[in-house]
């Protein structure tokens, strides 16, 4: 800083500051000019079009300027005029004898204000949205200096310094400029110029320049494209002041932010870079030390050590400068006592205080932002590693880790490891802080500081058992949370079956029981933390008492300055000591999470050599399996498949058949490499496509599911739609192939999902197609059409292996494999196997028995749809590409209707979605959310008690510090004001009393938080379980899981403590202001405008921060959903070789999540920096006032106490605003939970005054009266006035084409969908007038998709625990599973894995039949219940139903005609209307009936047998 001799210190400081700022402005101007010159030189090498683009990308002229901008210019001009007038007056009065010193200040200020005016005027010309940072800082500094000089001039006028000559001209100019400078200070804080801009492109963002305007979008970037965050390329000043974030906050202050407003992460900060770095270091350890487990912590440290080192440097500087204030307090008190060592000592001390606090503020913000960025890197990299592992898990590993657990690894464990970045440097900072504290204490209390060291070590040692206790509680808490999340995920995925079976209350109670267990461990963890808080709040007091007591016992002399210096040191040391339990707890939590993640990452993967893949065409054998044995459980004595030898020539069609549980699906899995291979070899030639038996559909639209990552080829896409019989379905769907099909394809029927799967496989144009029973879910006509168009035509030149239970599809195969008990018992062509007899003959005979039941005229073929038997079909086309002519010739003008939606405008398509966008509030969080939360537990009575406890703590703390400052002598040699014993006793009483109130407050907050969290969880859970099925159809399960996991965890562990922390910080801040104002009331002059400025900045910040947090919550759901979805479909993803694409998608979603997270964290630091800078200037003002008082005017000990508290003003001020902002951000989780607490509910489960009799329904008579159903109010009717009667005790078959309304009718019967009109009457009871539980518990259903819950066979058959073991065994025997279950070691307690993966689809269906047998309902509904079993098993199930449900009303939806041919009545639906309803015999007599056509199609398809 320049030096100006012979000037009073305030004037000299002002002149020096203006000169320095003017020099900095000129330097930046020169640098910018040089940069512009270099840019122009570089642009000469670019093409003319690029230059033209750069010109076109410029800004238009400002359309208008605001009143504030004009006022700012006027104030600058006014200040310049005042300084010029003062300078002219000095020259005019003194003439040639004028002193240089007298002209120096007005001359420098005149030059400075001229420069400021020029820069401010340039804002309109250049189009700045915000004033440059330097200009704004200049205005603020000028106002502070003006206030300081005005105070000094006031002392002159009051006669404090009679010997000094008063410069009245400068005094008048300074006073006259004060209002203008005050206004400019306010404008500088706000920053906005008020200039409204019109851009030539779509970019409407406002940028904040450093000096001469920020750079707009690069000229070569497309208009409207997302820019990379300027964080990595920002200059030093922009980085130090975090001004690079101001453009985003400016946009957020004008309108709610959207994801598109948030800049992209820099390449080095993206998930891909983090994942590559961590994964490479982790794998390197694995290779270098093959016998030992790699260290995940070491891989993280190796990947990000540079960031950790930079953060460590900032942390070290911050720690050192934070002790400057406590070190200098004793000198400051001595100065106020009259002990002046050198001239201007007071101002120099004040300047050192100010610079130290300034450095502390700047380094803290860089340090905190650095650890935030490092945490994002760690979380992104770890999440990607967990996701990649989830895609590669072997079957045994997959069984030990459910999808819910894997999601929890990502949602909880990865989060904790990332959060540890905040605590990483505390390990070495604590010893450094202790060393610095001991050095200061040695200066003040001498050798007594040894006792400080001992007391500190004892305090730290006391944490060791606490750490073990915390680790134990964390283990238990995480285990219970895993269990709850696993069961929650399972319930959400299977909510339909829970509602159909009236089990939702039972499973909800199970979840609440699990939550109670979780709360037990949570309660212990939080209450133990409250005890730890008491211990560590008491530790600094304990250390202070020991230190002062030892000093007195050793005969040392305590002074007010020494005591205040020690207290300030203890206060700083208190932070790391108070955070030490958090550090211990975080280390314990991180260690647990690292162990869990390491254990997961070490799990066995699918071996790369499970199958040997060679290029297509390199051999004529497409698939070759030699002497192979496979087992899903390698430790089982009985392998799943054994002695498998199979050779498939390229282009061959191979059919696989056999009874349920024979190993058909496992054979396909062995070719894919999914099932562990015990011996032998599997070799495939070329790429493969896999269609599983249970459809796996992503939650995107139909088009995205079919393309599956491949580029769009419109002609090929149309041919695929045609081959998969999807054209009519897409025409019927309101939004065509742009329909969002919901979580797991829930908005499509079973047949539609299967055909979308087939289309996905066909579009990939693979070499080998593995199809697992693809035709079971479609009707006979669609199945026949699919087989002809798909397998015989589109895949004519491909190698196809298809599993089927439908015998009619076997004759067309080149090779038929018959499986039984895991062995290929027969292999050959159809006719050869028929002649051989045995197992294959049994399957065919069962099929013929079913066909023989259909007695109708042989000549009916002539009157129905003609169709060539499949066996005699000779493919006339070689592959899908040859379908082109067929599609083109048959295409009608409406054929593209189903796929034309993509041409509509994005805003139109956004409205046309079957899945709701995630609800997101906008604007401020409602006060009602806070009030509702605070009143949730104990009716809010704990809130005033918490405030009272915190107030008492603050009062007692201030009292204890005041006592020590007052009771001790001011300087050495003065007599003490009280006895040393009284001194210590009073201090200990006050200090320990304050820590006791902290303990009480912590207990109250923990109690309040637990009770509130539990109430909100139960309320949300009950509302979710009572939500209508349409909510689950349109809401991905990952989105709901996000509320019950992430948001609930925030409520459990954070919200209450944020609320308590805000109250605590508010009271502490009021205490600091009270102490400072008591000593120097002049501080209130700046406190009030500072508070106004803080509130304005808080509102400016919170407008963006609130939306960033909401965007963050919304962006979290897709990450969780992709996890769940990918893990469920991992086999399909691997079967298509799509692991890389899904990994890329995961990395993209992680970046979408990281963008708002990074901006949100940076915004916090942006606000904190400005808050702390303001409070630092207030502290400096206070110091300047104190040093300006003549000696003896103020009591030194009280002034020292004010400084001691003032040292914490910046931290408390920023923490106050920050705590409120974080509370507002976190309270969004409460807001999101309340959204789910207000979900629309289904009808009541029980209506007490309208309950049916216990024996209802007695007859099972069902009457449909003008039944009309639509799925949404804005959608067309699905059922159009259905009226018919299903007589009680009769067997009703319900048939129709795909999409005819069969499943909708069943949903209306169970009231999953409430009718739009009409009614359903069962035994004279209108079902709309009784409770849902009364209705659904009296009906029974075997659904199309068999659902098993994780647990045991017993639990799946009898979840309500109403049946005896004997009754369960009888049901198992009747459904032909008794022998299978008895062969298991655990019998009825045999385990069922997630989704029933360890049981075949057919076995799952039989278990569902067992449920129906145990329920013994009078009405039974079968919704495609036998689609996944072979014909023999189908016949068996039908016999069981005829015998066991002979007196029941049985409604059967089926695509297999033999399943319904022996029904008493057949209902034929078409387009939601009744086409026919009569006995099968009468319908068959009418050759033109639709039922006759369906039977004819099925018979024709089967006529080759």
From Swiss-Prot:
Binding site residues for ATP: 658-665, 1296-1303
Biased composition (Polar residues): 881-897
Principal place of residence: membrane
Residue ranges annotated for the ABC transmembrane type-1 domain, each copy included: 314-589, 945-1215
InterPro entries referenced in this protein's UniProt entry, alphabetically: AAA+_ATPase (IPR003593), ABC1_TM_dom (IPR011527), ABC1_TM_sf (IPR036640), ABC_transporter-like_ATP-bd (IPR003439), ABC_transporter-like_CS (IPR017871), ABC_transporter_C-like (IPR050173), ABCC_6TM_D1 (IPR044746), ABCC_6TM_D2 (IPR044726)
EC number: 7.-.-.-
ABC transporter domain location: 623-846, 1262-1496
Stretches that traverse the bilayer: 11-31, 54-68, 71-91, 102-122, 131-151, 171-191, 313-333, 336-356, 367-387, 421-441, 447-467, 534-554, 940-960, 980-1000, 1055-1077, 1081-1103, 1149-1169, 1174-1194
Record keywords: ATP-binding, Membrane, Nucleotide-binding, Repeat, Translocase, Transmembrane, Transmembrane helix, Transport
Catalytic EC class: translocase
Bilayer topology annotation: Multi-pass membrane protein
Gene3D superfamilies the UniProt entry points to: ABC transporter type 1, transmembrane domain, P-loop containing nucleotide triphosphate hydrolases
Compositionally biased spans, kind Basic and acidic residues: 904-919
One of the protein's GO biological processes: transmembrane transport
GO molecular function terms listed in the Swiss-Prot or TrEMBL record: ABC-type transporter activity; ATP binding; ATP hydrolysis activity; ATPase-coupled transmembrane transporter activity
Disruption phenotype: Strong reduction in seed phytic acid, and strong increase of inorganic phosphate and myo-inositol levels in seeds. Seedling lethality when homozygous.
Family indicated by similarity: Belongs to the ABC transporter superfamily. ABCC family. Conjugate transporter (TC 3.A.1.208) subfamily.
Summary of the function given for this chain in its UniProt record: ABC transporter that may affect phytic acid transport and compartmentalization. May function directly or indirectly in removing phytic acid from the cytosol or in vesicle trafficking. Required for phytic acid accumulation in developing seeds. Phytic acid is the primary storage form of phosphorus in cereal grains and other plant seeds.
Protein name, UniProt field: ABC transporter C family member 13
Gene: ABCC13
């Amino acid at each position: 800083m320049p030096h100006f001799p012979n000037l009073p210190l305030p004037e000299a400081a002002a002149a020096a500051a203006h000169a320095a700022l003017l020099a900095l402005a000129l330097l930046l101007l020169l640098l910018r000019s040089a940069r512009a010159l270099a840019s122009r030189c570089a642009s000469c090498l670019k093409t003319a079009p690029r230059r033209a683009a750069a010109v076109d990308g410029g800004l238009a002229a400002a359309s208008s300027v605001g009143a504030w901008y004009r006022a700012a210019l006027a104030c600058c001009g006014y200040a310049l005029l005042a300084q010029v007038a003062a300078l002219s007056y000095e020259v005019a009065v003194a003439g040639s004898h004028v002193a240089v010193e007298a002209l120096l200040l007005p001359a420098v200020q005149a030059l400075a204000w001229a420069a400021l005016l020029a820069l401010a005027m340039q804002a309109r010309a250049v189009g700045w949205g915000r004033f440059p940072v330097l200009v704004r800082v200049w205005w603020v500094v000028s106002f502070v200096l003006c206030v300081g000089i005005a105070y000094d001039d006031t002392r002159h006028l009051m006669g404090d310094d009679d010997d000094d000559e008063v410069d009245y001209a400068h005094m008048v100019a300074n006073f006259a400029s004060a209002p203008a400078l005050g206004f400019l200070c306010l404008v500088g804080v706000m920053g906005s110029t008020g200039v409204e801009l019109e851009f030539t492109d779509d970019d409407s963002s406002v940028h904040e320049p450093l000096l001469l305007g920020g750079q707009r979008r690069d000229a070569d970037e497309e208009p409207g494209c997302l820019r990379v965050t300027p964080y990595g390329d920002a200059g030093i000043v922009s980085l130090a002041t975090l001004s690079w974030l101001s453009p985003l906050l400016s946009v957020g202050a004008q309108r709610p932010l959207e994801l598109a407003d948030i800049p992209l992460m820099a390449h080095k900060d993206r998930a891909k870079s983090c994942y590559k770095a961590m994964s490479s270091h982790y794998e390197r350890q694995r290779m270098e030390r093959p016998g030992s487990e790699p260290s995940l912590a070491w891989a993280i440290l190796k990947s990000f050590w540079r960031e950790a080192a930079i953060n460590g440097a900032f942390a070290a500087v911050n720690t050192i400068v934070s002790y400057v204030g406590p070190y200098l307090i004793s000198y400051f008190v001595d100065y106020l006592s009259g002990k002046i060592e050198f001239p201007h000592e007071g101002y120099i001390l004040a300047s050192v205080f100010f610079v130290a606090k300034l450095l502390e503020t700047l380094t803290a913000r860089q340090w905190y932002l650095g650890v935030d960025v490092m945490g994002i890197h760690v979380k992104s990299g770890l999440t990607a590693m967990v996701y990649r592992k989830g895609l590669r898990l072997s079957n045994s590993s997959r069984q030990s880790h459910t999808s819910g657990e894997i999601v929890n690894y990502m949602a909880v464990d990865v989060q904790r490891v990332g959060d540890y970045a905040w605590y990483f440097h505390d390990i070495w900072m604590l010893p450094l802080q202790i060393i610095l504290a001991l050095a200061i204490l040695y200066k003040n209390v001498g050798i007594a500081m040894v006792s400080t060291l001992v007391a500190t070590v004892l305090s730290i040692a006391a944490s060791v058992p606490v750490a073990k206790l915390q680790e134990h509680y964390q283990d238990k808490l995480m285990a219970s949370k895993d269990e709850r999340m696993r069961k929650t995920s399972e319930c959400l995925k299977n909510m339909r079956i829970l509602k159909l079976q009236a089990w939702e209350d039972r499973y909800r109670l199970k979840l609440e029981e699990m939550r109670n267990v979780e709360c037990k461990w949570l309660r212990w963890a939080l209450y133990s933390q409250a005890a730890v808080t008491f211990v560590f709040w008491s530790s600094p007091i304990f250390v202070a008492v020991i230190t002062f007591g030892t000093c007195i016992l050793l005969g040392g002399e305590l002074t007010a300055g020494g005591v205040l210096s020690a207290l300030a040191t203890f206060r700083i040391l208190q932070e790391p000591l108070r955070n030490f339990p958090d550090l211990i707890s975080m280390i314990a939590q991180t260690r647990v999470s690292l162990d869990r993640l390491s254990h997961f990452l070490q799990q066995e993967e699918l071996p790369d050599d499970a199958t040997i893949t060679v290029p297509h065409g390199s051999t004529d054998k497409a698939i070759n399996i030699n002497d192979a044995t496979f087992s899903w459980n390698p430790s089982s004595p009985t392998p799943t498949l054994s002695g498998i030898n199979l050779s498939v020539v390229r282009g061959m069609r191979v059919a696989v058949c056999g009874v349920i549980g024979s190993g058909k699906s496992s054979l396909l899995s062995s070719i894919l490499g999914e099932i562990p291979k015990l011996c032998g070899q599997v070799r495939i030639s070329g790429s493969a496509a896999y269609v599983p038996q249970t459809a796996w559909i992503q939650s995107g639209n139909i088009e995205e599911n079919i393309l599956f990552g491949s580029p769009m080829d419109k002609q090929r896409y149309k041919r695929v739609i045609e081959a998969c019989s999807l054209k009519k379905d897409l025409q019927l769907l309101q939004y065509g192939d742009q329909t969002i099909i919901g979580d797991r394809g829930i908005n499509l029927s079973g047949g539609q999902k299967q055909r979308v799967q087939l289309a996905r496989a066909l579009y990939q144009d693979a070499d080998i197609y593995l199809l697992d029973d693809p035709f079971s879910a479609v009707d006979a006509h669609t199945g026949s059409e699919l087989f002809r168009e798909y397998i015989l035509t589109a895949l004519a030149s491909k190698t196809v292996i298809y599993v089927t239970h439908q015998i009619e599809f076997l004759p067309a195969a080149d090779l038929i494999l018959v499986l039984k008990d895991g062995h290929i018992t027969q292999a050959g062509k159809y006719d050869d196997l028929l002649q051989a007899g045995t197992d294959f003959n049994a399957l065919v005979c069962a099929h013929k028995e079913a066909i023989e039941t259909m007695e109708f005229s042989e000549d009916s073929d002539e009157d129905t749809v003609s169709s060539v038997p499949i066996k005699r079909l000779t493919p006339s086309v070689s592959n899908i590409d040859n379908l082109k002519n067929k599609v083109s010739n048959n295409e009608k003008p409406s054929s593209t209707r189903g796929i034309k939606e993509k041409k509509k405008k994005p805003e139109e398509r956004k409205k046309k979605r079957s899945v709701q966008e995630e609800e997101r509030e906008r604007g401020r969080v409602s006060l009602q959310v806070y009030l509702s939360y605070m009143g949730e537990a104990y009716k809010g009575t704990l809130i005033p008690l918490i405030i009272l406890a915190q107030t008492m703590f603050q009062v007692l703390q201030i009292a204890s510090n005041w006592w020590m400052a007052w009771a001790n002598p001011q300087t050495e040699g003065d007599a003490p004001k009280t006895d040393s014993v009284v001194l210590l006793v009073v201090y200990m009483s006050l200090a320990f009393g304050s820590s006791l109130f902290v303990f009480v407050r912590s207990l109250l907050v923990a109690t309040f938080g637990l009770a509130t969290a539990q109430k909100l969880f139960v309320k949300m859970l009950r509302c979710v379980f009572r939500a209508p099925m349409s909510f689950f159809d349109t809401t991905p399960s990952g989105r709901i899981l996000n509320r019950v996991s992430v948001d609930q965890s925030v409520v459990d562990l954070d919200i209450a403590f944020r609320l308590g922390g805000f109250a605590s910080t508010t009271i502490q801040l009021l205490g600091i202001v009270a102490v400072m104002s008591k000593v120097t009331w002049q501080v209130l002059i700046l406190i009030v405008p500072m508070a106004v400025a803080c509130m304005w900045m808080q509102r400016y910040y919170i407008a963006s921060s609130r939306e960033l947090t909401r965007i963050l919550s919304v962006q979290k759901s897709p990450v969780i959903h992709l996890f769940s979805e990918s893990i469920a479909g991992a086999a399909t993803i691997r079967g298509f070789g799509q692991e890389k694409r899904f990994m890329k998608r995961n990395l993209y979603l992680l970046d979408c999540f990281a963008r708002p997270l990074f901006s949100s964290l940076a915004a916090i630091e942006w606000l904190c920096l400005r808050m702390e800078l303001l409070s630092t200037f207030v502290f400096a003002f206070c110091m300047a006032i104190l040093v300006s008082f003549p000696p003896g005017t103020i009591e030194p000990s009280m002034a020292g106490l004010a400084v001691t508290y003032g040292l914490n003003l910046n931290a408390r001020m920023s923490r106050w605003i920050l705590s409120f902002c974080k509370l507002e951000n976190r309270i969004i989780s409460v807001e999101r939970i309340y959204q789910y607490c207000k979900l629309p509910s289904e009808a009541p489960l029980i209506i007490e005054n309208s309950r049916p009799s216990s024996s209802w329904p007695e007859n099972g008579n069902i009457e449909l009266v003008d039944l009309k159903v639509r799925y949404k109010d804005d959608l067309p009717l699905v059922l159009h006035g259905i009226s018919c009667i299903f007589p009680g005790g009769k067997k009703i078959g319900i048939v129709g084409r795909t999409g005819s309304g069969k499943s909708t009718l069943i949903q209306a019967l169970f009231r999953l969908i409430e009718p739009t009109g009409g009614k359903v009457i069962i035994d004279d009871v209108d079902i709309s007038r009784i409770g849902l539980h009364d209705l659904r518990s009296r009906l029974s259903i075997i659904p199309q998709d068999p659902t098993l819950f994780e647990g045991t066979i017993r639990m799946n058959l009898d979840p309500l625990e109403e049946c005896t073991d004997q009754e369960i065994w009888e049901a198992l025997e009747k459904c032909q599973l008794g022998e299978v279950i008895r062969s298991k070691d655990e019998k009825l307690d045999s385990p069922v894995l997630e989704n029933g993966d360890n049981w075949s689809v057919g076995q799952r269906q039989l278990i569902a039949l067992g449920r129906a047998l145990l329920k013994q309902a009078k009405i039974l509904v079968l919704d495609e219940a036998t689609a996944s079993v072979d014909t023999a098993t189908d016949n068996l199930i039908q016999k069981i139903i005829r015998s066991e449900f002979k007196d029941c009303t049985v409604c059967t939806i089926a695509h297999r005609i033999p399943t319904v041919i022996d029904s008493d009545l057949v209902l034929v639906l078409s387009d939601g209307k009744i086409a026919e309803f009569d006995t099968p015999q009468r319908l068959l007599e009418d050759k033109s009936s639709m039922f006759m056509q369906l039977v004819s199609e099925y018979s024709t398809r089967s006529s080759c047998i």
